[in-house]
């Protein structure tokens, strides 16, 4: 199709495409198009777009009389609307509301009423183009454009085209960026409220605002997961003082932990993104329970210096699960050890500090040891595309006793690193899945540990189903 001076004329809900170099300069052309479009008996349909070839020099009147002559094939314009049905998705309510607000801002006075009337009467109609005349023709055909809008309101049910945004705008595309992700940590942390950005940011919800397209689980898959849950957990002694309890947490307990973490995370002292004095931010969201851990001073305290909030209390259910898991690990160590006092490898612990870390799909945590200022450690691992991790350490006296760190994994699988040296290449790897509990104390108390990556492996479907119906808001 050879057109050299092509332009689009937006007339009401019509788009008339014209090669101006191949038309006679007639001031009555636009009026003729309008009359033809509004004439029910006209051969020119409201949804037609005509492209005139450059070498075809004829008037508009000649075009419509030529269709009845034998030379129709030589003068008939090319129609870019091919004879096939277009299949598309219906716009969402959110998209329609956003476009209504955009369009409303562009109109004023009577035009705004016309627009609202048009949009409200076209629930089942897909529109194409904007309800305005293009800038190029706005001054010349403003009356004609207004007339077309009024007439098309009453004839909207006869028009079936595809809706798209008339005016592109980037103003609405940046409002969904998380203020938590972009905030900067104040260089000092010696008092509350040092970061105005953090204190004013909205609470972070670990239920991420995105839809995950998943197929409905088959009965075979559901039965397999039920059998796995009924089978119970299995214990593995990784190294002296380190025990992995596979599939230890029941689905109900996993749902309970996630819902309580979400509920606490949306309140005072909830999830935030910690950082350092140089402005660097950790690749996770953190919430402290019992006491606050300051990553800059590496000390625990009664308040969070960044905003002065008081950490929530540790739920009783969490402490009960920790105590029960440690007893199971002691029993496992005693069974697998040749030593008569093998069960003393992992001391009993009643946690008083819980650091909950939430990782998204790109989250990670470098190799580190629990500081000598830590009080206790308790790890949750990720949920639904995120990753939760908590550390509970103790003072020097507690470190000498080898009080353990307890890590609960919930959600997607995580690649967990551990080793005696702070060297990623020499570190060993464990894949922690939803429901796993990892405990390391005594001789493994000072082991370096971290999270390399979050794997795109979703937790059991039963977990999702129970979470949907039992979530605490």
Swiss-Prot record:
Residues bound to Fe cation? 368, 391, 449
| Superkingdom to which the source organism belongs | Eukaryota
Uppermost EC category: oxidoreductase
Q: What Enzyme Commission number(s) apply to this enzyme?
A: 1.14.11.51
Q: Which Gene3D superfamilies does its entry note? A: Alpha-ketoglutarate-dependent dioxygenase AlkB-like (2.60.120.590)
**What UniProt keywords are attached to this protein's entry?**
Dioxygenase, DNA damage, DNA repair, Iron, Metal-binding, Oxidoreductase
Q: Which reaction does it catalyse?
A: an N(6)-methyl-2'-deoxyadenosine in DNA + 2-oxoglutarate + O2 = a 2'-deoxyadenosine in DNA + formaldehyde + succinate + CO2
Q: Which GO terms describe its cellular component?
A: cytoplasm; nucleus
What is any one GO biological process for this UniProt entry?
DNA repair
Which free-text remark accompanies the cofactor?
Answer: Binds 1 Fe(2+) ion per subunit.
Q: Where does 2-oxoglutarate bind?
A: 357-359, 461-465
List the Gene Ontology MF annotations in alphabetical order.
Answer: DNA N6-methyladenine demethylase activity; metal ion binding
Q: Name one Pfam family in it.
A: 2OG-FeII_Oxy_2
* Cofactor (UniProt): Fe(2+)
Family recorded in the similarity comment: Belongs to the alkB family.
Task: Tell me the function of this protein.
Answer: Dioxygenase that may catalyzes DNA N(6)-methyladenine (6 mA) demethylation. Requires molecular oxygen, alpha-ketoglutarate and iron.
Write down what this protein is called.
Probable DNA N(6)-methyladenine demethylase ALKBH1B
Source organism = Arabidopsis thaliana (Mouse-ear cress)
